[in-house]
Amino acid sequence: MFKKEAFKKSVKDNIKFLYRKTIEEATQEQIFQAVSYSVKDVIIDNWLATQKAYDEQDPKIVYYMSMEFLMGRALGNNLINLCAYGEVKEALEELGFDLNCIEDQEPDPALGNGGLGRLAACFLDSLATLNYAAYGCGIRYHYGMFKQKIQNGYQIEVPDNWLKNGYPFELRRPEYAKEVHFGGYVRVEYDPEKGGNKFIHEGYQAVKAIPYDMPITGYDNDVVNTLRIWDAEPIVDFELDSFDKGDYKKAVEQENLARNIVEVLYPNDNHYAGKELRLKQQYFFVSASLQAAIAKYKKKHDDIHKLYEKVTFQMNDTHPTVAVAELMRILMDEEGLGWDEAWEVTTKSVAYTNHTIMSEALEKWPIELFSRLLPRVYQIIEEINRRFILAIQAKYPGNYEKIKKMAIIYDGQVKMAHLAIAAGYSVNGVARLHTEILKNQELKDFYEMMPEKFNNKTNGITQRRFLLHANPLLADWITEHIGPDWITDLPQLKKLAVYADDEKALQEFMNIKFKNKERLAKYILEHNGVEVDPHSIFDVQVKRLHEYKRQLLNILHVIYLYNQIKMHPEMEFYPRTFIFGAKASAGYATAKKIIKLINSVADVVNNDASINGKIKVVFIENYRVSNAEWIFAAADVSEQISTASKEASGTGNMKFMLNGAPTLGTMDGANVEIVEEVGAENAFIFGLSSDEVINYENNGGYDPNVIYNTDEEIRQVLMQLINGTFSNDTELFRDLYDSLLNTKNTDRADRYFILADFRSYADAQKRVEAAYRDEKGWAKKALLNTACSGKFTSDRTIQEYVDDIWHLDKVIVRKK
């Protein structure tokens, strides 16, 4: 039970102990720290009770291994899950502070970047809320991927120093440190006791992995699970002898080598050193996490052969899949198991989630790099590969084409997805269409050989962050109309459908949307200096920047609309605000050029008085969870326009839907299931189907030049990329122009079918405008999107993982 007076005293005490100040003298940032420590005090009681329950009930634990955890701010989320948000807000008001302002002092933890990391965060929230024992396992990046600045329209990457003031919601746990080894060589000697060879790793560089634990609170159930992120430190901190001899570089050499591992998420791998660092990162957190999990298991259990009965490792994409070989190494070299015993334990303990259809994103490592950096692990993968090839040969005698396609080591590379599929007891896709494409296209040979492993788990999102916290006005309205059960049972939202023809309810629903649009318009004015009209259609595309996600199609259409208004100033046109938010990987030149184009178009369009503000273009800098929450709540239209067959699932589409924004999209990823739930009449679908795209890719027959030569308006749009309309440098966007029309090297012209879908997209946008003019009709669409979003909760996804893959039991936490 939350005690307000005790909480106020705790905040004052924290200010005194942490800063030697009275509360009146404290800065906003210091108040944030003090409030967070007071909240953590409450959480720690639950955390201890949860650990006690796990010790007593000995449940099976899932270790969710992910390169990214895009958590978002913790203070507000924890208060929501503790059901203490209102009381803390009130307590702080009595102390003279505004909780919203305090929340704004918290940096977004820079532990992830895109949908992969946000999914992992939603899953942790659902696991805790559903009373399942789980650990998240990742890396404590010091600077994240980067903080995005926009200068002269270009993305500039600066370090995201989120830890500079310390982070109150983490606990350093040096007593659980592990050693991780890189490089060296493997010595083989005969072991007379076992009657076989013993493999001894020597001459390695050792790094200390230090765990930092972050609490993951369940909603209103006293459960607190753990996200364990690993920091790297040298075994020997500081070489005083070298320092005294004047060799200052050598004195800190080991520290620098260790620190490099955890400095940034996804270091640029356009060069060899970057590739090596990425592999180091992956092995570092996987090895430390496996060592910790096995140590925890052995505290209560003597028989390592039964590890899989109490532990399961879920590998989130290919980044952690080195876990297969590392688990084998630990079981054989440290626990003394033979190959067959270790293989049985491993193949019952590891499961793999595939997150991409893009074959270039399925990680492959050069043999030379892998074998040099991880010599013993590479030996094990060689043996797994040898045995796997024998299994393929046994099933498909003489079919060398199969071996070529399925081998784990082939053509000088180690193929991590193949390793995960060969060893994992489960392989899942993340939307129904995605899983079907994996089974019938990308991983067809594996599916034919072992169909029992493959299953689908459509992604989901946590409504506690993306509605209850992100959109409190709508959350309160929903609770008034159908009660609070939707917070832990999202399909309850279906009850809202009865209000789809209730004019009063529809008006209230749209009034809330308008207030959220006003809030976002204020943010845009403060951060971008652009005045946008909240009465305009807020058309939003926020997501990682990649060519297949087709931000380029969106901005080319904006240019097309701009041309239409310029040529026909008298035409009826409903004002639009096109909102973009996206980070491009530091080494991804094309994606960065698209950001520049969006900003160059914005500069021209926003400053052209002749169009009378009918179009505004806004690029929101440094898109992240905390500003995403405002954006989802305010959007009218959800742009989900990836090339069909390329987006595995998407979860932004679900967040927009939950907040009452109809989808404008292709039949790709989870869009297919969204349309099934809400009805095609409440979405705006366009473009080639996935079958049509795959057919063109496999058989040819698409030439964008035909469209360019026959469609004058499309030709005009493309010519404006290179004729000085948006830059005095006519060569600036030449590469984007060329990518749409000219085949280069192995890349087809317009490989993401932007021109093929352009007219269909423009027509869908016209349908959006016509629908929006019908206020009641639009309100009904918006309300029904919220009402039909119940399927897309991560609670449902996690329950499916539990039922079909992990087989966990619920844990009941009872505080004293």
Placement of each model-derived feature along the sequence:
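A conserved ligand/cofactor-binding region detector
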Residues: M1-K816
